[in-house]
Amino acid sequence: MEKSSSCESLGSQPAAARPPSVDSLSSASTSHSENSVHTKSASVVSSDSISTSADNFSPDLRVLRESNKLAEMEEPPLLPGENIKDMAKDVTYICPFTGAVRGTLTVTNYRLYFKSMERDPPFVLDASLGVINRVEKIGGASSRGENSYGLETVCKDIRNLRFAHKPEGRTRRSIFENLMKYAFPVSNNLPLFAFEYKEVFPENGWKLYDPLLEYRRQGIPNESWRITKINERYELCDTYPALLVVPANIPDEELKRVASFRSRGRIPVLSWIHPESQATITRCSQPMVGVSGKRSKEDEKYLQAIMDSNAQSHKIFIFDARPSVNAVANKAKGGGYESEDAYQNAELVFLDIHNIHVMRESLRKLKEIVYPNIEETHWLSNLESTHWLEHIKLILAGALRIADKVESGKTSVVVHCSDGWDRTAQLTSLAMLMLDGYYRTIRGFEVLVEKEWLSFGHRFQLRVGHGDKNHADADRSPVFLQFIDCVWQMTRQFPTAFEFNEYFLITILDHLYSCLFGTFLCNSEQQRGKENLPKRTVSLWSYINSQLEDFTNPLYGSYSNHVLYPVASMRHLELWVGYYIRWNPRMKPQEPIHNRYKELLAKRAELQKKVEELQREISNRSTSSSERASSPAQCVTPVQTVV
């Protein structure tokens, strides 16, 4: 039975209007910190909390006094809409890297915040509640031994956070209840924090992606492809966007018959078209052939129309993301794959990418070997046993084959898995990233995510489990994480081809879980419209695009006309240490590498400027010398001798 994909409870309580802040977001200052990448809060405390009795002090002294007070505060800096729900003093954080540290634990409606003044600078741990997967009680009231009674939070970003409470203090129960309430608001009929957060940014990220503009950039509509509004009310397919691009010679009535033959009504629609050859990438779900091998004349005609729209080739490739054995097994459920007998001039290729359950188990194994400790002696064999990089390789290799067929083969391709919202999104978006330099810019990548993932119905709510306490839900899977990992692998192989840096990718992943922004909420465009997310929440792109300098790759050089062919072999892939092992202070560099790049480039620019100044000075001196040499006072008149 299909699980309900509704997200109506995500914002069950309308957010009250709050005074907008024009300050940008900022991270809490930390040194010995396992701080996740949070947005920034320029206002650390409200103005009411600062005494004004000494206003006669000089401004410098007042600032110094107030900054000292802020350093001593144990409460977290609060975002607009954020408020404290519980606080427990004398709690011990069992840090797996630096040992136990005692401090104050605070729960707000957005974050879990721990601060210890025992160290200099203060130790700060700051995690959004959205990243929490489950909360467990450790020990009972009669537990003996130091730090044997407390709570453990298991997080979606690889971490486990363990806190010890004193049994006599009775703070554990209160903290546990508030964590269960505010970390899982959907399970408690409460709104996600994104509906409470009201920060104002210079740019509205919800307006970043306009499908008409994006299709126009690709040259659509044209004589072979048209934009249809048949799905304007999401009646053809409730998981597809309102606007679809389909073959120009296929009328809307036939689209309905094609939809009845495709799983969930997800017909083949255009994702990308080559600007020269007109070869296309179209995406869809599996055909409903079943064990009896049913056929659909309308579906066969439709794929023929896709092939005919490309005059460069008289063949079409169908890339099925699944292993062939899985595709065959789907026939028993009414699904299946295209028969080459039924679809003339079509070649079917299976890409052997495993399903969401295999990927979830692979990530679980990866977490076991990277957090908290790494076993050096068996590191390579342990990593191999997770099969994580093997899955990354298969996804990249599949996207590479698609891109190569379109670019080198000038052949149109159709891509699908079972339902067309997981592996299909990985493959189409990665292939488009290889083919189109626009998507390798910051804004272009944001458009790519909006288009191929959000508008085409990747089930973010189900795959991530926003605000849902059911951590064992079989629908959870790291599909989008794998896509971002593949992008990172490409940036390693082509360090100057992407406008964005590693921090950009990590920030996207952190806010995939945080529930601070509305971008990744719900499962479809239709659901986001019903929830009115553009009006009730802030877009992640609003935040990112307000401080582009933080996310820009200083080595970027525009390669807009270049097609990237990454090497998809195990020898060229590596574990993304900057993400999966970033919490281990022994494994991360002293400073982010992109900051060092910026410093070196700034130094180079400074030296280039000096060279230019010296060249101008030399040129000026040379000109001055020439002028003096040719002046009348210095001129010697040649003597002509008459013979």
UniProtKB/Swiss-Prot annotation:
Modified residue annotations for Phosphoserine: S6, S9, S58
Any one GO molecular function term: phosphatidylinositol-3,5-bisphosphate 3-phosphatase activity
Membrane topology label: Peripheral membrane protein
Region (Disordered): 1-56, 615-643
Residue ranges of coiled coil: 593-627
Impact upon substituting C417S: Loss of phosphatidylinositol-3,5-bisphosphate 3-phosphatase activity. Loss of phosphatidylinositol-3-phosphate phosphatase activity
Post-translational modification: Phosphorylation at Ser-58 decreases MTMR2 localization to endocytic vesicular structures.
UniProt keyword terms in alphabetical order: Cell projection, Charcot-Marie-Tooth disease, Coiled coil, Cytoplasm, Disease variant, Endosome, Hydrolase, Lipid metabolism, Membrane, Neurodegeneration, Neuropathy, Phosphoprotein
Active site: C417
Positions with biased composition (Polar residues): 1-12, 23-40, 632-643
Protein family per UniProt: Belongs to the protein-tyrosine phosphatase family. Non-receptor class myotubularin subfamily.
Disease the record associates with this protein: Charcot-Marie-Tooth disease, demyelinating, type 4B1: A recessive demyelinating form of Charcot-Marie-Tooth disease, a disorder of the peripheral nervous system, characterized by progressive weakness and atrophy, initially of the peroneal muscles and later of the distal muscles of the arms. Charcot-Marie-Tooth disease is classified in two main groups on the basis of electrophysiologic properties and histopathology: primary peripheral demyelinating neuropathies (designated CMT1 when they are dominantly inherited) and primary peripheral axonal neuropathies (CMT2).
Domain notes: The coiled-coil domain mediates homodimerization. Also mediates interaction with SBF1/MTMR5. By mediating MTMR2 homodimerization, indirectly involved in SBF2/MTMR13 and MTMR2 heterotetramerization.
Name of the protein in its database record: Phosphatidylinositol-3,5-bisphosphate 3-phosphatase MTMR2
UniProt lineage: Eukaryota, Metazoa, Chordata, Craniata, Vertebrata
